[in-house]
Structures are given as structure tokens and as C-alpha cells.
């Protein structure tokens, strides 16, 4: 359900009429070559579209207005081939609503020592042209990503690729509809938040629906739809004997399949990209959606448990960002600890809803009791997650602003089998260690729900926070509690002043 085939970033190159026809012809020629090279890069998942060299305030304003109104344009990569007086850019940058990446490069990689002359110097001026452009961006307090290096360098293309993936996620949030099926889990604080401010800040709309809105679709499920989905379950997962045809718990799997078909139809009809539910508002549903939610997440939907719409939206955004990359992304919860004198770890899991995109093999499909909710035993996929680097991401509402918290972690193989644990899980080592990471996370007000991603890194989240204009707190191998507390205190002052325009 994630289609990025029509998405594009525009390559906009700055110059001025001063240089004359021949120089400007070469500027355009070089710019088109660079745009084609970036467009062909395997690191950049979207189209890179060359736009004409802009040489005047009116041309700059026009291209920024066009970018704002073009639905397929998700951002602009800007480069100053020559010197482009930056006062010309004020009007355009002031109205530009799309994310901007400043590429500080030049057409040639090396200086042609034997032939360099003043014609070459006048043509290749990005070393100071981009500094002029950088000044006006900073003067306007315009958040942007800056990428420095030769455009053919893999490092540069990778950074541009990361930024383009982030703006894909940002573009998704601008149009995202989140369905809250039921309300927030009663008395829970961190999953609450200002949905109006969220729509102003991120673009996403969050609205509530009753479980009966989904029940209408469940009741329309046909025998053929049901049989087809059960066949998919049987081929995709290792079903326990009790769930196979004629098994004692087969009816539970059938009911889970009905819920998936109904829930999927509800989401498709409403154009929703993310959803929440809660075990306290299930209505006539016979079980909490387990395998249904897991499979919907695997198909790209965002999800948050217990009404957690912020995490649901972020799961969706990160799933869009990581399309085509190795590794998965899932709704997650810090569940329990493994404290030892040598090393301490977190076991992440949830009641049911961990995405199989992070599974280390073919999941097992099982039915077990669920101690809360008062419903029948739900079906779910059970698996471990592979070892490797990952991040946990939490978006929280601090009252005066949104705060994004990131903890870099390393997943490890569980120290033993978990034969009696009937849920999907992942064991990780927090950076720099559990003691510092958990202290910092708690001081930051980080949620117990997170987005866990094997494919997205902190750099993505840094770019995202800049685009969104929100606070970012990173917990990594360099974090100390003292410096982290200072950062929180400094941010309180910064964001107060920034938001009041002082």
C-alpha cells in the first residue's frame, strides 16, 4: 500500500544574469548532467527532476510557488553553481512550504591544475555562492539539510537518499488520516496529546471511530474471502496443530481472519494509513486484533496500541521512509528487563501487535489467552527478531511543543529459548547502556510505546525533526546524564523563545 513511484524532488540551481549567455549555458548543461546522475543513483528512491537555472527574484519565486502546488514534488535540492545574490531568494524562500536540502557541491571534482583560468573560476563558484545562499537561509531561520561533497561521491548520494526518504515520510504525514478505533486507554497520560496542534504541525488528521464502524465490514466478509485468507495464513506461517483444519482452536483463527478482512476494508474505504485500537473499546468483536494488526503493519499501515495515535502516525511515516530498505519497522513497547552484573538488556514486546517485518524467520501462528480485555483468546504471530543495530523512536506532546526522542540500540540474540512466552519479541542493548539510556529516556518523558526500526537511523530522525520544527533528543553511545539534563534545560529556553518569535 506504499507507492512512491510518482514522487519527485526538484533540482533547482541558482545563478544570475550577470555571467552572460555562454556561462549560463554551461551552468544549465552541468546542472542537467548532475540531475541525471542523481536521478540514476540507487541511493535515491525518488525521481530527481531538473528545473531551469533561476537567475532573478521572479524566477525563484515562481519555482517555489510551483513546488508548493505540485503534488508529486516532495522537496527541493538547491545548489548555487555560480554566485547567486541571496536577496533574490528571500521572496521564494519565505513562501516555500516544501522541505529543502542544500547541496554544496561543484560540477568538477578536482581542480584542473594545468588549465585552470579565470573563465573556469567565474563558472565554478559554488564554494562562495553556496555560502551566500547559506547566509540567507540562516538569516531567515530556515531549517534545511546541508550535504557537502562531490555529487558523484557515494557518501553524498547516500545522504541525499536519506533526506529524500525523510521527505517521503513527511509528505505522507501531510496527507495521513489516522483512525482511532475506540478511545485512549483509560487514565493513560503519554498516549494523549493535542490532535489539533498535531494537524497544524505535521498535517495528519486524527479522528475517532466506534468498533461498530468496523463490525459493519466484518459482517460483510464472504466465505471465499475467508477461505482465501486462511490459505494465506497456512502458507505464510507455521500454524500450531490446533489451528489447522479440524483443530480445536481453528475457530479462533477463523474469527481473527474475519477481523482482519473487516478492518482492512474499513481502512481502505476511509483512506486511512494508520490506526489505533484499545482492548477497552472492542464492542462485539470476539477478540483483540492480533494477527490482523501484525499483517496490516507488515503491509505498511501505522499502528499504535491503546489509542496511541502519535506512535501510529510515526510507524506509518517510518515505514514509508524505509520502503525498499533491508530490515523492518514495528510498533514496540519496552516490556521487561534483564539485569545482570555484566550487562543489562530490555525485552521489547507487546500484548500481540509486533510487526513481522522484524522477524528473524517464518513466524509461528498461535492462539493463547490474553489476561485483559475480557474477550476470547486471540490469534497472533510469534517470533524472535534478529540481532543488529536499530533505533527506538518516541514522539510525545510536552504541552508547549512536540518532542522526538531517539535511543540507539543493538538487538541481540536471546540468551535462552522462550518456550512459554506467546508473543513476538526482541532483546536489545541500549546505548550507551541501560542505566544511562533509561535514565535519560525517563528524564525526557519518553513513552513506553515506541517505533522500533532496523532500517532507519538517527540521521533520518534528525532530518525529520528539522523539517517538522520539533525538538529532538538523542540517546546514543556518547550520552551522559549530566549533559542530557543540560540539553533538556537549554531546549526549554530555546523553544520558548523560538515559538514566540523573539
UniProtKB/Swiss-Prot annotation:
Its EC number is 5.3.1.4
Task: Name the Gene Ontology molecular function terms of this record.
Answer: L-arabinose isomerase activity; manganese ion binding
Pathway in which this enzyme or protein is active: Carbohydrate degradation; L-arabinose degradation via L-ribulose; D-xylulose 5-phosphate from L-arabinose (bacterial route): step 1/3
Q: Which GO terms describe its cellular component?
A: cytosol
What InterPro entries is this protein classified in? Ara_Isoase_C, AraA_central, AraA_N, AraA_N_sf, Fuc/Ara_isomerase_C, Fucose_isomerase_N/cen_sf, Lara_isomerase
Instruction: Please tell me where Mn(2+) binds in this chain.
Output: 306, 333, 350, 449
Q: How is the cofactor bound?
A: Binds 1 Mn(2+) ion per subunit.
Query: What Pfam families does this protein map onto?
Result: AraA_central, AraA_N, Arabinose_Iso_C
**What protein name applies here?**
L-arabinose isomerase
The record lists the organism as: Flavobacterium johnsoniae (strain ATCC 17061 / DSM 2064 / JCM 8514 / BCRC 14874 / CCUG 350202 / NBRC 14942 / NCIMB 11054 / UW101) (Cytophaga johnsonae)
Highest classification ranks of the organism: Bacteria, Pseudomonadati, Bacteroidota, Flavobacteriia, Flavobacteriales
Amino acid at each position: 500500500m506504499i507507492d512512491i513511484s510518482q514522487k519527485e524532488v526538484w533540482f533547482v540551481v541558482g545563478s544570475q544574469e550577470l555571467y552572460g549567455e555562454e556561462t549560463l549555458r554551461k551552468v544549465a548543461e552541468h546542472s542537467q548532467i548532475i540531475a541525471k546522475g542523481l536521478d540514476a543513483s540507487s541511493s535515491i528512491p525518488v525521481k530527481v527532476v531538473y528545473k531551469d537555472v533561476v537567475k532573478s527574484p521572479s524566477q525563484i519565486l515562481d519555482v517555489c510557488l510551483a513546488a508548493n502546488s505540485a503534488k508529486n514534488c516532495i522537496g527541493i535540492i538547491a545548489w548555487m553553481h555560480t554566485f547567486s545574490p541571496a536577496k533574490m531568494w528571500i521572496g521564494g524562500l519565505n513562501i516555500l512550504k516544501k522541505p529543502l536540502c542544500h547541496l554544496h557541491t561543484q560540477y568538477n571534482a578536482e581542480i584542473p591544475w594545468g588549465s585552470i583560468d579565470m573563465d573556469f573560476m567565474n563558472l565554478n563558484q559554488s564554494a562562495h555562492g553556496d555560502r551566500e545562499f547559506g547566509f540567507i537561509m540562516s538569516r531567515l531561520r530556515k531549517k534545511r539539510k546541508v550535504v557537502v561533497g562531490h555529487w558523484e561521491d557515494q557518501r553524498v548520494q547516500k545522504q541525499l537518499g536519506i533526506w529524500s526518504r525523510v521527505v517521503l515520510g513527511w509528505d505522507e504525514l501531510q496527507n495521513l488520516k489516522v483512525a482511532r478505533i475506540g478511545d485512549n486507554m483509560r487514565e493513560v497520560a503519554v498516549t494523549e496529546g493535542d490532535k489539533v496542534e498535531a494537524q497544524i504541525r505535521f498535517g495528519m488528521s486524527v479522528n475517532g471511530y466506534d468498533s461498530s464502524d468496523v463490525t459493519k465490514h466484518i459482517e460483510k466478509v464472504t466465505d471465499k474471502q475467508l477461505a482465501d485468507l486462511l490459505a494465506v495464513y497456512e502458507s505464510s506461517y507455521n500454524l500450531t496443530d490446533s489451528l489447522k483444519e479440524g483443530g480445536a482452536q481453528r475457530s479462533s483463527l477463523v474469527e481473527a481472519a474475519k477481523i482482519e478482512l473487516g478492518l482492512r476494508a474499513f481502512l481502505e474505504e476511509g483512506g486511512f494509513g494508520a490506526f489505533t485500537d484499545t482492548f477497552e473499546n472492542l464492542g462485539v468483536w470476539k477478540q483483540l486484533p492480533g494477527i490482523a494488526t501484525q499483517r496490516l503493519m507488515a503491509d505498511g499501515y501505522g499502528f499504535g496500541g491503546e489509542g496511541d495515535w502519535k506512535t501510529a502516525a510515526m510507524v506509518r511515516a517510518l515505514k514509508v521512509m524505509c520502503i525498499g530498505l533491508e530490515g523492518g519497522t514495528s510498533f514496540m513497547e519496552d516490556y521487561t528487563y534483564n539485569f545482570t552484573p555484566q550487562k543489562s538488556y530490555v525485552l521489547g514486546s507487546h500484548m500481540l501487535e509486533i510487526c513481522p517485518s522484524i522477524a528473524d524467520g517464518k513466524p509461528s501462528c498461535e492462539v493463547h489467552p490474553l489476561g485483559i480485555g475480557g474477550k476470547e483468546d486471540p490469534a497472533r504471530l510469534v517470533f524472535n527478531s534478529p540481532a543488529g543495530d536499530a533505533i527506538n523512536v518516541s514522539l510525545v506532546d510536552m504541552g508547549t511543543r512536540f518532542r522526538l526522542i531517539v535511543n540507539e540500540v543493538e538487538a541481540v540474540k536471546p540468551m535462552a529459548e522462550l518456550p512459554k512466552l506467546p508473543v513476538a519479541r526482541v532483546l536489545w542493548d541500549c546505548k550507551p547502556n541501560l542505566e544511562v539510556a533509561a535514565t535519560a529516556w525517563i528524564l525526557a518523558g519518553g513513552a513506553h510505546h515506541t517505533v522500533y526500526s532496523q532500517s532507519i537511523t538517527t540521521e533520518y530522525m534528525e532530518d525529520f525533526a528539522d523539517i517538522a520544527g520539533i525538538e529532538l533528543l538523542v540517546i546514543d553511545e556518547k550520552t551522559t546524564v549530566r549533559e542530557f539534563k543540560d540539553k533538556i534545560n537549554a531546549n526549554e529556553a530555546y523553544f520558548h523563545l523560538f515559538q514566540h518569535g523573539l
